[in-house]
Curated annotation (Swiss-Prot):
GO terms for biological process: neuropeptide signaling pathway. It comes from the Eukaryota. Myoactive peptide. The modification Arginine amide is found at residue 9. This is Tachykinin-related peptide TPTAFYGVR-amide. The keyword Secreted applies. Keywords: Amidation, Neuropeptide, Secreted.
Amino acid sequence: TPTAFYGVR
């Protein structure tokens, strides 16, 4: 889950 690190990316 990239959103967990980037938030939107």
